[in-house]
């Protein structure tokens, strides 16, 4: 895909549309009930695309977001991706049964690096076969900081052939998060139809817009409010 001019991106993207591209995230291994309540209240207020949470919080978020239009996303095999194929399939079914409407699954990076692409293919195909009949959006997390460009391309091709809804850069727990190079590469491989989610280290508007410019259609961040408020100010000045 041809890189868009940043002014064109801004001209064609409303504040509401930007908010609707953000996955509002709380994936820390610690926290209180108040953290989850705040996350959901903010997502409802700003009309973010979804809340991204660990599977144990799915039922709570479903209740808190009832009638809001905000989706509930569960992180599967998170953050290392080193679960078995069968374990990830169980986690996916369980999260959906509890009300998750989006699934973000971490691939088995080690299997990929050992050349065991059959394992990566199987876990992605299983996720798609579980999610699609349930009407659940499925995303594959590459954890790009650990992969060569060739490995990133391999996963994107497998994901595209399997019929995923999104490929995603990062968990936010790796050595680095999303960057322009990786998002552009992923967009080039999957083409214009499949979504590309940029996540990890996205804390300001400039970074978010740069990633959208090269093909990101979702932004995973815990800084969504700051990004949207900054965009409101930017649009006012135009």
From Swiss-Prot:
Cite a GO CC annotation. cytoplasm
| Pathway entry | Carbohydrate degradation; 2-deoxy-D-ribose 1-phosphate degradation; D-glyceraldehyde 3-phosphate and acetaldehyde from 2-deoxy-alpha-D-ribose 1-phosphate: step 2/2
Q: Name one GO biological process term.
A: deoxyribonucleotide catabolic process
Catalytic residues, per the record, are 104, 168, 197
Q: Name one GO molecular function term.
A: deoxyribose-phosphate aldolase activity
Pfam families assigned: DeoC
Q: Could you tell me which SUPFAM superfamilies the record lists for this protein?
A: Aldolase
Q: What's its EC?
A: 4.1.2.4
This chain's function reads: Catalyzes a reversible aldol reaction between acetaldehyde and D-glyceraldehyde 3-phosphate to generate 2-deoxy-D-ribose 5-phosphate.
Protein name stated in the entry: Deoxyribose-phosphate aldolase
Q: Which organism is it from?
A: Bacteroides thetaiotaomicron (strain ATCC 29148 / DSM 2079 / JCM 5827 / CCUG 10774 / NCTC 10582 / VPI-5482 / E50)
């Amino acid at each position: 895909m041809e890189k868009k001019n940043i002014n064109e991106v801004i001209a064609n993207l409303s504040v509401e549309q930007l908010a609707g591209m953000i996955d509002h995230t709380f994936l820390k291994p610690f926290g209180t009930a108040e953290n989850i309540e705040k996350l959901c209240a903010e997502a409802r207020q700003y009309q973010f695309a979804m809340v991204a949470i660990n599977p144990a919080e799915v039922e709570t978020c479903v209740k808190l977001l009832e009638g809001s239009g905000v989706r509930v996303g569960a992180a599967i095999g998170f953050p290392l991706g080193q679960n078995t194929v069968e374990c990830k399939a169980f986690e996916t079914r369980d999260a959906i049964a509890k009300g998750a409407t989006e699934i973000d699954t971490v691939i088995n990076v080690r299997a990929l690096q050992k050349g065991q692409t059959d394992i990566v293919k199987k876990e992605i195909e299983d996720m798609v076969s579980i999610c699609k009949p349930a009407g659940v959006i499925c995303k594959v997390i590459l954890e790009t900081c650990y992969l060569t460009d060739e490995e990133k391309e391999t996963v994107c091709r497998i994901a595209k052939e399997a019929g995923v809804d999104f490929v995603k850069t990062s968990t936010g727990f790796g050595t680095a998060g999303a960057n322009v190079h990786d998002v552009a590469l992923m967009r080039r491989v999957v083409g214009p139809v499949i979504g590309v989610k940029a996540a990890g280290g996205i804390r300001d508007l400039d970074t978010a817009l740069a990633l959208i410019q090269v093909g990101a259609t979702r932004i995973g961040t815990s800084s969504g409010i700051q990004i949207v408020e900054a965009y409101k100010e930017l649009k006012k000045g135009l």
